């Protein structure tokens, strides 16, 4: 379990919701649901598990969660997220079982079935449902309301369900194809949330039975109406109107804004987008700016509807998204609850960010202090680190990065072209760079670092110490970071004489040094590539009479590459103020060089 997970586990809420485990590449590998997110997610990292779960846990590098209002919503959200992301461990841990669907068969006399396999057989499938219990509950209700075929009897032989009015799949009923098509449409509407027609029919039948003094039959219809009402509540996913909509919520704190967008498609929450950023103006105005940018992104297709929080100006949003999208600012009811849910998740995400940030700051500060203690020096608040880069002595450069309070200060980074060294001499290059940097620090009265770290071994460190002490009369601690044969941070060298400082590989101090070494190496090698590319460019332009340094610079600035120059015309080059004769000579030379 890494430190990120440790910190996130401490911040989990006790609400119901869904959690998404991710691997080191950011891929969602498992989606789960929980009545209590805190207890459920923590359980993965405590105690022993079976082999399958141990394999899952071994791949978890991070996790996210979505808070829901109820366990039922968590159940149904889990299904949608699994369908959308297809996490590999959901398939493994459920032993190949898929979620249940309700099916209407394509037969002369259609049947209602529960199945876990969706086939291209002309049947109609509804679902998926969270479990077999939920699917069975719905099917039982459908069986009581709709007289589909329920038996295996031949059509000319009536069954028990015929006698209680729940099956009309018999020749004696004289049903037509149009009748069954109408029945199928009624079921489709019912399962898609449009149940008003059925409820009204049941109410009418209840009244008829009551008027005929058939009170037991009237009570049966009353119970059916109550069952439909209960089912409507329990099976709410997001909305049962199958509409596509985006639901926005946002939260601000400490100069930061978090915006959460729930993507609802076909009535199901399939995905969310989370963005956190500093805001500088009025919160509502910055939210509107974000919305405008959101739909300029080609990945975000505009839905039919958008729900926004109550404090956002509706007309402004309508102007941003255009007439083809309906914008709603819900004031009450289920739609308002959905906006509240998005806002609640925005608050949870932003609060978690601050909590993690505070822990990270405290952790980094502790690492800096401990590093100073281990080295026997004052806390190294400012660290300057150096690395050289060259290929067989060509285009030699050096680079310096600065870390303050454990974080990179990129404004303070510096690049150096080696001026006095010929050939591949790493020690001489380090001597030149240390001399140039700290002569300027001394001359201009700049604040010296608390620690200098050289990306190198004993030789480079001793060279740096010699320049500081014997040439510049400066007393600044110098340490070296040696790499192993795999080019990985291996050990810290420090002291007089130099010795290896014992740092546990899993310590925060080691991680800090590793980040510094990676950063200075990245910065140096990037600079070296830039210089080498420029030098290569210039060398191909050598030997053309009338093409001096300034004109070469113009060509480099405007054409960017040799290929672009080769493809240019004489007129293109003349446009830069280069004479026609020189332009033609250049193109002739490049043409010869390419053959």
UniProtKB/Swiss-Prot annotation:
It is found in: Cytoplasm. InterPro entries: GIY-YIG_endonuc, GIY-YIG_endonuc_sf, GIY-YIG_UvrC_Cho, RuvA_2-like, UVR_dom, UVR_dom_sf, UvrABC_protein_C, UvrC. One of its GO terms (biological process) is SOS response. Keywords: Cytoplasm, DNA damage, DNA excision, DNA repair, Excision nuclease, SOS response. One of its GO terms (molecular function) is excinuclease ABC activity. Pfam families: GIY-YIG (PF01541), HHH_5 (PF14520), UVR (PF02151), UvrC_RNaseH (PF22920), UvrC_RNaseH_dom (PF08459). Residues 14-91 form the GIY-YIG domain. The UvrABC repair system catalyzes the recognition and processing of DNA lesions. UvrC both incises the 5' and 3' sides of the lesion. The N-terminal half is responsible for the 3' incision and the C-terminal half is responsible for the 5' incision. PANTHER family: UVRABC SYSTEM PROTEIN C, UVRC/OXIDOREDUCTASE. Interacts with UvrB in an incision complex. This is UvrABC system protein C. It comes from Streptococcus thermophilus (strain CNRZ 1066).
């Amino acid at each position: 379990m890494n430190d990120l997970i440790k910190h996130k586990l401490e911040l989990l809420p006790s609400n119901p919701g869904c959690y998404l485990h991710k691997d080191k590449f950011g891929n969602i590998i498992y989606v789960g649901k929980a009545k209590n997110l805190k207890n459920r997610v923590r359980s993965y990292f405590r105690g022993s598990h079976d082999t399958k779960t141990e394999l899952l846990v071994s791949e978890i590098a991070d996790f996210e969660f979505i808070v829901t209002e109820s366990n039922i919503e968590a159940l149904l959200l889990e299904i949608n997220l699994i369908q959308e992301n297809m996490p590999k461990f959901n398939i493994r841990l459920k032993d190949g079982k898929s979620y249940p669907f309700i099916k209407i068969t394509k037969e002369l006399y259609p049947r209602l079935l529960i199945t876990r396999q969706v086939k291209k057989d002309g049947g109609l499938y509804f679902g998926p449902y969270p479990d077999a219990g939920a699917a069975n509950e719905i099917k039982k209700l459908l069986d009581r309301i709709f007289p589909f075929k329920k038996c295996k009897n031949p059509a000319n032989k009536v069954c028990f369900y015929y006698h209680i009015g729940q099956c009309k799949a018999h020749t004696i009923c004289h049903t037509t194809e149009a009748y069954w098509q109408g029945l199928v449409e009624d079921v489709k509407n019912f399962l898609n949330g449009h149940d008003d027609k059925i409820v009204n029919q049941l109410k009418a039948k209840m009244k008829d039975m009551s008027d005929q003094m058939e009170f037991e039959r009237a009570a049966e219809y009353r119970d059916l109406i109550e069952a439909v009402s209960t089912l409507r509540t329990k099976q709410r996913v997001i909305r049962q109107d199958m509409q596509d909509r985006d639901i926005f919520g946002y939260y601000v704190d400490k100069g930061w804004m978090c915006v959460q967008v729930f993507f609802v498609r076909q009535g199901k929450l399939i995905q969310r987008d989370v963005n956190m950023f500093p805001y500088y103006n009025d919160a509502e105005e910055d939210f509107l700016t974000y919305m405008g940018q959101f739909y300029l992104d080609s990945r975000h297709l505009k839905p039919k509807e958008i729900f926004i929080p109550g404090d956002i100006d509706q007309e402004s949003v309508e102007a941003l998204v255009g007439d083809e999208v309906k914008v709603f600012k819900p004031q009450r009811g289920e739609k308002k609850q959905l906006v509240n849910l998005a806002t609640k998740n925005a608050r949870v995400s932003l609060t978690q960010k601050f909590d993690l940030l505070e822990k990270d700051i405290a952790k980094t500060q502790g690492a800096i202090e401990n590093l100073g203690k281990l080295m026997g020096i004052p806390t190294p608040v400012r660290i300057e680190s150096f690395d050289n880069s060259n290929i067989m002595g060509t285009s030699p450069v050096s680079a310096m990065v600065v870390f303050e309070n454990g974080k990179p200060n990129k404004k303070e980074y510096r690049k150096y072209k080696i001026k006095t060294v010929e050939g591949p001499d790493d020690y001489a290059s380090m001597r030149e760079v240390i001399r140039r940097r700290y002569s300027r620090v001394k001359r201009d009265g700049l604040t010296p670092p608390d620690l200098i770290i050289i990306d190198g071994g004993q030789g480079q460190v001793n060279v740096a110490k010699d320049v500081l002490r014997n040439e510049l009369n400066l007393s600044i601690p110098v340490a070296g970071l040696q790499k192993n044969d795999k080019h990985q941070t291996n050990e810290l060298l420090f002291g007089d004489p130099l010795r290896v400082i014992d740092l546990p590989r899993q310590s925060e101090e080691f991680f800090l040094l590793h980040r510094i070494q990676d950063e200075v190496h990245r910065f140096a090698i990037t600079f070296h590539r830039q210089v080498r590319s420029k030098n290569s460019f210039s060398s191909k332009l050598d030997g053309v009479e009338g093409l001096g340094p300034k004109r070469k610079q113009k060509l480099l600035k405007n054409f960017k590459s040799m290929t672009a120059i080769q493809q240019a015309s004489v007129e293109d080059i003349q446009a830069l103020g280069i004479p026609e004769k020189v332009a033609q000579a250049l193109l002739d030379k490049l043409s010869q060089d390419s053959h």
